[in-house]
Amino acid sequence: MSKKLYIKTYGCQMNVYDSVKIQDLLYPFGYESTEDIKEADIIILNTCHIREKAAEKTYSELGRIKKLQNTRKQEGLNPAIIVVAGCVAQAEGEEIFSRTPYVDIVVGPQSYYNLPELISKVVRHEKQLIDLDFVEEAKFDNLPEQLYPQGASSFISVQEGCDKFCTFCVVPYTRGAEFSRSVEQVYRESLKAVSNDAKEIILLGQNVNAYHGKGPKDKIFTLADLLKCLAQIPNLARLRYMTSHPIDMTDDLIKLHGTEPKLMPFLHLPVQSGSNKILKAMNRKHDRDYYFNIINRLREARSDIVLSSDFIVGFPGETEQDFEDTLDLVHRVKYGQCYSFKYSPRPGTPGAIRTDQIPEHIKSKRLTILQQELATQQLAFNQSCVGSTMRVLFDRDGKFEDQIIGKTPYMQSVYIHNPNKSLLGKIVDVIITKAALNSLTGEIL
């Protein structure tokens, strides 16, 4: 009889990728995934530490799991093994056992390949096991081959960690220094994904355009080199990459957006602020003019490219003028979609110890104003697509029985009616008939 594995994933697409790899890792040991936490023999929370709210969600969920464990005991059932993985595990370590002593395993994002051994120790009645080692090479060398097909769109991790040390960010402390997988590893995993019917590959990294992996004859490949290599894979239709840092947008990568048709005309390029003063305080290593120059060059290379970004409001010391500078940047760039957040002090980061923290009510007010402007731009872009024909990759079911959902080249969700689901996994021409803030509606030509 198979054992059941339940994984709840928080945060970024890298965590989504890691969760898939954990499934692949534990499958040979008899664990099959379930979406029902009540039947799980192992419960894994793959956590995010980028903001305080995200971290506290972990502890709230652990509280609910404790109640589930108590119910099991009352019914005479064995309790599940509880694992806290990911960036909260890396950042808080032993503190997790102090706050939630019923947790069995704490494992960092570079160490989860040791989960089979850690789980076997818990089965042998060892408790409160922790593994937070930072050996990036070991993680990638021990990743299993893809067992669970990800569908029409497949995420592949090519780079982890960050050397930029932005003063608001915990990534260098939870994911470590920048490390890139070899070209051979990435190419082999990409071939496997395409053999499992993936039409699109999305390359992942905390700072993906800093990729510098070893290729044939020990040549160092840039991200542009890697993309050119992957573009040669037969039956692969689309390539994307995320998340990028403006300082690593090299000439060859910018030019590739104009020459490689498989590279989609959509780029997530976080700027965080439009104020030079705040950019310097954040240690972003560039100013607003540098960012504008990158945007202009991308649009010169490919005129139909659409941009996305991240913004943080209320960073310590942010004045009304600094915030106005951010709004000005948004107005000038004109984004297709964006993500925006209030600054959240993270323990251990330089921003957290600054004495000029912004009051919450001011942060909330600024976030509302910014999000209204970003929503206006996103809706305008979506509405501009009505009446046009777009190539859509259908990759998942909709809420309704005869509905499926796909993605345009610009990462917009498109809903259509397809009663027999025959278009799942295919790229087809769709005429856009309706636009909303977060989605499009279309019809097959």
UniProtKB/Swiss-Prot annotation:
Disulfide bonds: none
Chain residues that bind [4Fe-4S] cluster 1: C12, C48, C87
Molecular function terms, GO-annotated: 4 iron, 4 sulfur cluster binding; metal ion binding; N6-isopentenyladenosine methylthiotransferase activity
Catalytic activity: N(6)-dimethylallyladenosine(37) in tRNA + (sulfur carrier)-SH + AH2 + 2 S-adenosyl-L-methionine = 2-methylsulfanyl-N(6)-dimethylallyladenosine(37) in tRNA + (sulfur carrier)-H + 5'-deoxyadenosine + L-methionine + A + S-adenosyl-L-homocysteine + 2 H(+)
Name of the featured protein: tRNA-2-methylthio-N(6)-dimethylallyladenosine synthase
Major localisation: cytoplasm
EC number, as in UniProt: 2.8.4.3
Listed PANTHER family: CDK5 REGULATORY SUBUNIT-ASSOCIATED PROTEIN 1, MITOCHONDRIAL TRNA METHYLTHIOTRANSFERASE CDK5RAP1
Organism: Rickettsia prowazekii (strain Madrid E)
Residues forming coiled coils: none
